[in-house]
Amino acid sequence: GGFGSKIYHYAEEAIVTWAAGKLRRPVKWTAERSESFLSDAQARDHVTHVELGLDDNAKFVALKVSNIANLGGYLSTFSTGIPIYLFGTFCVGPYTTPAIYVETKAVFTNTVPVDAYRGASAPEATFLVERIVDLAADELGMDPAELRRRNFIPADAFPYQTPVALQYDSGDYQTTLRMALEAADYAGFEARRREAASRGKLRGIGIATYIYACIMAPSAVAGALGARAGLFESAEVRVHPTGSVTVLTGSHAHGQGHETTFAQLVADGLGVPIEQIEIVHGDTNKIAFGMGTYGSRSLAVGGTAIVKAMDKVVAKGKKIAAHQLEASEADIEFKDGQFTVAGTDRSKALGEIALTAYVPHNFPHDELEPGLDETAFYDPKNFTFPSGAHIAEVEIDPETGRLEIVKFTASDDFGRIINPMIVE
């Protein structure tokens, strides 16, 4: 994580580019650790006052937030958009609060500038919302888990339009919380608290639920923030005459495992062995457009662009297969790397179709150009909204102040997971 800090255009990048041009050779500059702390964009310096209103049934009716946000010494790329726009939208959380008022005063100080960095305003918004929910539960004498359950957006209410711009696409917050409570043995906590007290220790348990907006991608959002940029992603899928595949993606990998996950997408989609798939990224001489890796967007946006390009490859392959198999295009099915005439055993492998595309002796020239190489762009209309519930159980020695995290439980809904090992 933390790749949002790479969005910002640092002065050193411009100087290194200039130096490389002057010297006509590669130039590399790397900040030392102390230099990074003094110059990299950072995040989360807020002073916040929050009020939560509830009715007689312990239902949330209003949330009011007054916030002072430190922007640092000068503006960065998305500086004000993070502690103002995104912070305000994340104050909804997973709850049905009908009225939300957020006022943020942004101030300049003598610190480094702020930008998107590890959550881009979601951690601080989640902290204040979950903290005030706990305070409300304590004041009402309610179980904090029950107060949350009572105010969650119902699973059958999606898509759910929040009062602060965002429309949530899906979610099942009751289930993620229930799973976390069961895994943490929440019901048995009081017995563990008494046992800790018998040893002279203090034991506490805390719950936090969250919503996050992944895939920083809808270009309309960039426009709303005043950024003159598109946030789409591009992909090119090139099937070679041998049947091997090269994918050129604008989502640059630097430790996320794109080479594995993107190759897995292609292997599943085209029925090609994973060892015959090459993933190319980070080369501006080969890749026309790329918006990058940040904002939890690579698989959902970059991966979807790859899927859309594969769909075009399959669509063209069906036309070629229909011509070769003397069948209607509507009767051609594609599965596991084979183009088959529906209801028959007549088929052509993807490799055969690719070879025909590049050696087009028996080819529908009136309908198609030779080659099997397709490009796609993907600009989603909305974010995706993963969610979850985390529970921490801690023990404190009141004599020394030493704190021990006895158990930490997390239940997260990430939607469809392509590669579980990378998630782990």
Question: What are these model-derived regions, one by one?
Answer:
Residues 2-175, 179-424:
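Cofactor-binding beta-sheet edge motifs in enzyme active sites
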